[in-house]
């Protein structure tokens, strides 16, 4: 019995209890990573709870009176299905890619069979990152032939300035870590679409965000960011104007309220690539 085979730990994606369109959560370690058992000690489950609680609170009395929830992959007992995976590459080979590290993680987990076309993958990566605390693939910016279905939280993250600082870490509250995680999950679900009226694309100014889109320049929004990528603006809103990415009236533009990956789900739901241009 390998040391990582512990009671309650899953090494596979368990059979779905829904239609298979869901956000599958994974605790992923590099080859040389230390197992902190975040999948077993409720740390990851608590993070997902805080994310979903905040999302639901910001969607109440909008498209649905009781709001919506993120459609996480769950088990028969309604607990989140979390898969443990140790990769075959070392931390340095991932961390050095900075904000683009998620583009290393996606094909890495795919090699182990985590490539269900119905699923979006959210990775809690137990290692470092040269530049950022979290990052995501952007479906509307993906080039042909590239799979863009993965978002990642790097924990503890940055080698210079840990991601658990500035009111971060696994805590029973919607803090900086939870905000970063939800921000990236919304990215991989398609927010902010390029067709949104306030969609922001960063200029080429020699920063890690050069040329990256999918944001808003509206302080307080969960999708707000700045060119330098360094902001501790408190997230207060989820498209409070209902004009960019949630419950808006632009019928040809992606709307998270109509996503396949939220519940309740509308009758004709959208995938993250809906009207990507």
Which residues are covered by each model-predicted region?
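Propeptide-to-catalytic entry region of secreted or membrane-anchored zinc metalloproteases
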Residues: 2-120, 124-138, 164-169, 175, ...
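Short consensus segments that form the blades of beta-propeller domains
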Residues: 16, 140-144, 170, 211-214
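Structural recognition of the beta-strand scaffold that forms the well-ordered cores
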Residues: 22-27, 119-125, 151-155, 179, ...
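Secretory-pathway extracellular proteins and peptide precursors enriched for disulfide-bonded cysteines
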Residues: 62-64, 124-130, 153-155, 214, ...
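Catalytic zinc-binding patch centered on the HExxH motif and its immediate surroundings
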Residues: 129-154
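Cys/His-rich zinc-coordinating "finger/knuckle" motifs
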Residues: 140, 202, 260
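The catalytic-center signature of Zn2+-dependent metalloproteases
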Residues: 158-251
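A recurrent domain-boundary module in secreted/ectodomain proteins
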Residues: 237-277
């Amino acid at each position: 019995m390998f040391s990582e085979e512990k009671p309650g730990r899953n090494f596979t994606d368990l059979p779905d209890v829904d239609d298979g369109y869901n956000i599958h959560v994974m605790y992923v370690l590099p080859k040389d990573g230390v197992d902190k058992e975040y999948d077993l000690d409720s740390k990851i489950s608590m993070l997902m709870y805080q994310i979903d609680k905040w999302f639901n609170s910001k969607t109440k009395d909008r498209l649905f009176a009781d709001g919506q929830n993120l459609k996480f992959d769950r088990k028969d007992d309604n607990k989140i299905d979390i898969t443990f995976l140790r990769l075959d590459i070392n931390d340095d080979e991932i961390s050095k890619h900075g904000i683009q590290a998620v583009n290393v993680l996606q094909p890495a987990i795919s090699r182990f069979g985590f490539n269900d076309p119905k699923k979006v993958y959210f990775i809690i990566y137990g290692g470092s990152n040269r530049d950022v605390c979290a990052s995501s693939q952007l479906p509307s910016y993906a080039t042909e032939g590239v799979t863009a279905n993965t978002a990642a939280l790097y924990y503890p993250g940055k080698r210079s300035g840990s991601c658990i600082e500035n009111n971060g870490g696994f805590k029973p509250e919607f803090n900086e870590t939870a905000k970063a995680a939800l921000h990236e999950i919304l990215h991989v679900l398609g927010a902010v679409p390029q067709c949104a009226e306030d969609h922001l694309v960063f200029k080429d100014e020699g920063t890690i965000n050069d040329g990256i889109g999918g944001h808003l320049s509206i302080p307080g929004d969960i999708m707000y960011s700045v060119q330098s990528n360094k902001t501790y603006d408190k997230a207060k809103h989820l498209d409070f104007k209902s004009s960019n990415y949630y419950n808006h009236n632009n019928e040809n533009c992606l709307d998270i309220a109509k996503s396949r990956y939220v519940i309740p789900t509308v009758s004709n739901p959208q995938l993250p690539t809906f009207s990507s241009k």
